[in-house]
Amino acid sequence: MPVRAQRIQHVMQDTIINFYSTSDDYGDFSNFAAWPIKVDGKTWPTSEHYFQAQKFLDEKYREEIRRVSSPMVAARMGRDRSKPLRKNWESVKEQVMRKALRAKFEQHAELRALLLATAPAKLVEHTENDAYWGDGGHGKGKNRLGYLLMELREQLAIEK
């Protein structure tokens, strides 16, 4: 999937970059964006597939999530509470997200360039659907995905 070249060359005029839908200008930052990642020897269709699968210890169910056709289906499977969540999920979910994001932005040079080009803007997953990973739609959410992307951006700039 090509990154829109005009975004990479875009001179940052705003201090906040909102993203959410994969069709938005910065939609490639979404975990639903169709950028495959390779983690621990397996290829995942999206970072959403990887993240949702890591909620479970059942290897068979994790593999089912990896093989589904869309990130929306993977997200739905990740919310299935008939399957037991791993007990330490709340304490490891940000670590899992960091691993997914690092894989995504290290394995796709054009995405890495896009992320680096956003500095020093604040990145915000702008959605009413999530007040933990996003801003809750009103700016009062935790925006953890945005903060993890900014953290990764800093690390990649140092490693450059």
From Swiss-Prot:
Enzyme nomenclature, EC number: 3.2.2.-
SUPFAM superfamilies: YbiA-like
BP terms from Gene Ontology: bacterial-type flagellum-dependent swarming motility; carbohydrate derivative metabolic process; nucleobase-containing small molecule catabolic process; riboflavin biosynthetic process
Molecular function (Gene Ontology), one example: hydrolase activity, hydrolyzing N-glycosyl compounds
Consequence the record notes for mutating E48A: Loss of enzymatic activity
Effect of gene knockout: Strongly represses cell swarming but no effect on cell swimming. Cells lacking this gene show significantly reduced FAD and FMN levels (both by 13%).
Effect in UniProt of substituting W89A: Large decrease in enzymatic activity
Reactions it catalyzes: 2,5-diamino-6-hydroxy-4-(5-phosphoribosylamino)-pyrimidine + H2O = 2,5,6-triamino-4-hydroxypyrimidine + D-ribose 5-phosphate; 5-amino-6-(5-phospho-D-ribosylamino)uracil + H2O = 5,6-diaminouracil + D-ribose 5-phosphate
Keywords: Glycosidase, Hydrolase
Entry's family note: Belongs to the YbiA family.
Record function comment: Catalyzes the hydrolysis of the N-glycosidic bond in the first two intermediates of riboflavin biosynthesis, which are highly reactive metabolites, yielding relatively innocuous products. Thus, can divert a surplus of harmful intermediates into relatively harmless products and pre-empt the damage these intermediates would otherwise do. Helps maintain flavin levels. May act on other substrates in vivo. Has no activity against GTP, nucleoside monophosphates or ADP-ribose. Is Required for swarming motility.
NCBIfam families: ribofla_fusion (TIGR02464)
Full protein name: N-glycosidase YbiA
Organism: Escherichia coli (strain K12)
Taxonomic path: Bacteria, Pseudomonadati, Pseudomonadota, Gammaproteobacteria, Enterobacterales
